Amino acid sequence: IRPATVDDLFALVALLRSHDLPVDGFADLLRASPQHVLVAELNAVVVGSAALDVHGPHALLRSVAVARDLAALGVGKRLVSDLLAQAKASGVTSVYLLTTTAAAWFPKFGFTVTDRARVPADLAATVEFTKACPASATVMSLSLSTP
């Protein structure tokens, strides 16, 4: 697992599309904040991705995908865990996500379903919320604040 580079863009977009995940805004995020986009590689082939779109103390977890034949090996769990640790270390206090297929998978990290109206305005204005994901997508959140 390593930070992505713009050279990974084609492979990452292909991976996201193979999972029917939105790619709107992904290239811009990768160019602006490559440190917030992680890739997993196997034999020099991109097999996983996860990204954080950071807006001050809030972040949107997006673009989590793993090659289908490697899905049971914990690659996705490692990608998400690494990004959440990075987020916490950089001062992010809350992470949100949208999903249409994985609402049962994210609670293992502490995410809970939340109301769309509770999403901070800066995240609600992102392309994921306004264009890329359907209004029927499940919204989940995780607090990284230490009590």
Short names for language-model regions:
Residues 7, 56, 100-101:
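Short beta->alpha linker loops
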Residues 93, 100-128:
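Conserved active-site alpha-helix within GNAT-family acetyltransferase domains
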Residues 13-46:
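Active-site rim helix/loop that mediates acceptor-substrate recognition in acyltransferases
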Residues 66, 72-89, 97:
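Conserved acetyl-CoA-binding loop-helix of GNAT-fold acetyltransferases
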Residues 119-147:
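C-terminal "cap" of GNAT-fold acetyltransferases
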Residues 39, 45-53, 58-65:
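Conserved beta-strand in the GNAT
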Residues 1-12:
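A short beta-loop-alpha structural element at the N-terminal edge
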